[in-house]
Amino acid sequence: MAKTNSYKKVIAGTMTAAMVAGIVSPVAAAGKSFPDVPAGHWAEGSINYLVDKGAITGKPDGTYGPTESIDRASAAVIFTKILNLPVDENAQPSFKDAKNIWSSKYIAAVEKAGVVKGDGKENFYPEGKIDRASFASMLVSAYNLKDKVNGELVTTFEDLLDHWGEEKANILINLGISVGTGGKWEPNKSVSRAEAAQFIALTDKKYGKKDNAQAYVTDVKVSEPTKLTLTGTGLDKLSADDVTLEGDKAVAIEASTDGTSAVVTLGGKVAPNKDLTVKVKNQSFVTKFVYEVKKLAVEKLTFDDDRAGQAIAFKLNDEKGNADVEYLNLANHDVKFVANNLDGSPANIFEGGEATSTTGKLAVGIKQGDYKVEVQVTKRGGLTVSNTGIITVKNLDTPASAIKNVVFALDADNDGVVNYGSKLSGKDFALNSQNLVVGEKASLNKLVATIAGEDKVVDPGSISIKSSNHGIISVVNNYITAEAAGEATLTIKVGDVTKDVKFKVTTDSRKLVSVKANPDKLQVVQNKTLPVTFVTTDQYGDPFGANTAAIKEVLPKTGVVAEGGLDVVTTDSGSIGTKTIGVTGNDVGEGTVHFQNGNGATLGSLYVNVTEGNVAFKNFELVSKVGQYGQSPDTKLDLNVSTTVEYQLSKYTSDRVYSDPENLEGYEVESKNLAVADAKIVGNKVVVTGKTPGKVDIHLTKNGATAGKATVEIVQETIAIKSVNFKPVQTENFVEKKINIGTVLELEKSNLDDIVKGINLTKETQHKVRVVKSGAEQGKLYLDRNGDAVFNAGDVKLGDVTVSQTSDSALPNFKADLYDTLTTKYTDKGTLVFKVLKDKDVITSEIGSQAVHVNVLNNPNL
């Protein structure tokens, strides 16, 4: 049986070493030389590096196979050796398909080290190939590369957008380990042995541990904000842990082949124009970095049209990471961004709807299209360096936290179109099951996801669908086709969130098997008509459009339904399988209507009880309780849920059978307290609209006589904060780190007051929780009932957010400003405490808190 690609989904199970040059048996090749790796081959140096490390020995025939794909078993061997993992000769991995094979002990070693995982079904696929995205994921994990990233990650390759490996690939790009291929990154392409050797060697040289006994440094210079250049001997023996810099730490080191020079990558940017002490083992050096901008390039990026937190990116000089505007300001440089449409007219794409900016931050809600953006960097009192680039604005994936509801619809018209987010048309119908018949086609009719804390129908352009088996169900532009009998899982993705839907494809054509009536027991007054909704379904539970010939109505001999008085047809466009039909009471009595197919098999039934048409009672009742004679009309109306409630004057027979609503022409309705609520007659209904909390009597009269009465209690029940979900935080060790409310609480930015996520309330509400952004009431949390993003009359105060520093803190630049709390400096050490309180003036009203510890590395008290 052919292998599936299920192991490719196990990103975390595809290890880094698997991408390195392959070993298909533990037979050694002679020396470094491989006949199929000629001198000058682009990966020769990396292959030789791994040979020197004892990580690879080649294939049994003495070749290397640089163009062949690497398998996972061979990778386990290489990974074990490159990391010097302990190997138990008798060890067996937990994977059932990797036991008692030549590489078992190596697979066991990397599994024990936490480097690899299987597919979740006890499989490892030792002979399986590895794609570039899976490689990137494990390379990042094995060498802890995420902690070594400098600056924000930016997606520069369009084929990475929405891909599961987007972040991991961007980390490799950020660190200079990968540069893509021909304008693409090709995340799904299998990695060759030569490519694997190149990636592993580059990474190990920069981030692998080394013996530093023979290293000696003669000079240290800051070559760029995040780089040190060391000169000396034996520098190839140094590791990043051997280098320290005040206020920062080294995260990687890359030495020249002869060990006479090395480039050190720092975790942050050095302070400009300041004497800095650098220590390499037991040696100490003082250096200063004077920043000079010589070259500038605007990154050609694609941005989302309505996403907050986006900014123009540009690179300076030959630095790999993106430039930092705040850092440039510290280095006595001013930055200006100028945006124009392609015709040269100003483009108001920056925050505040401006065409120029000093931060490069984009507005939310930008018109889609291409724009020209010029970045100007000017040294104060000196020259200006500038560059213009093109950026693209599109509707990219929607940031979602959960996929709540997925509805597929069958394209029964076979026209290649299924309405999305709206009523279906023609013969198309929504699927209740996950069953398809061979040859059927379907697509999404609706997908609801939680976006910014609110359940919304997702834009179809933000959705991607992949099939686990294209031979069973194929997918083209999210349009699925049942190709053959079997099972396949559709993985639906919105942003970084996925949901799996398992479909079964059969060869059993759809047929009508059920007719259900709602209600299935009908009490109706003679000569009156009441609605009955009929639902017709097939053997899978999906809607079935039944025409006149499909259903035979067998009427009871009691005559409760007249001959020809009922014809169940459910083929109306847009509502296949469902039809509401008026059933008229004929003769007084009772009986059951049976529904049969052409073969006489019973599909369902409807019991009908027809009573005499005398109106004995009239009952003033809630529309929501029509037909429930004797129920009290008194009710409670919560203004936080709805502002209106409806009544009608219902007619009942002497048997308490509901007939129909009374015509209210000639009737009058009165609210006895207009300050609390008013009441109006609208058609055959009385509509009561609440204004303010209190009780009010509603009287319905005709010619002065009371026809109905109800008491409505208007309430506005208290909503309070039940708990708070704070963001996880880490100790801040570096300078120039900004700490504010956004450090501990997830915010959805707004030009006015921001929405605060993670505030759990005592009752559900459709209104947003916001925080006052500025002014005397900064930090006030409130329920924005009118949705205007400003606290005013009618909104509900929920509590306050505050920030303070502990008494033992040494944070001289601390401000009790939630949006500008602290920018860390070289001697900062202490703790900031963010609290959510019911009342900021009552310290015992705390609901929750989150502490942020600050401990900058060069603090003299450490």
From Swiss-Prot:
Q: Name one GO biological process term.
A: external encapsulating structure organization
Q: Does the keyword Signal apply?
A: yes
Residue ranges occupied by any SLH domain in the UniProt entry: 30-93, 94-151, 152-214
Location(s) in or outside the cell? Secreted, Cell wall, S-layer
User: Among the entry's GO cellular component annotations, what is one?
Assistant: S-layer
Q: How far does the signal peptide extend, from start to end residue?
A: 1-29
The UniProt entry, under InterPro entries, shows: Cell_Envelope_Struct_Comp (IPR051465), SLH_dom (IPR001119)
- Is Repeat one of the keywords UniProt gives this record? yes
Q: Which residues form a coiled coil?
A: none
GO MF terms on file?
structural molecule activity
User: Pfam families this protein is in?
Assistant: SLH (PF00395)
Alphabetized, the UniProt keywords read: Cell wall, Repeat, S-layer, Secreted, Signal
- What job does the chain carry out? The S-layer is a paracrystalline mono-layered assembly of proteins which coat the surface of bacteria.
| Name the record gives this protein | S-layer protein EA1
Query: Which organism was this protein described from?
Result: Bacillus anthracis
Lineage, uppermost ranks:
Bacteria, Bacillati, Bacillota, Bacilli, Bacillales
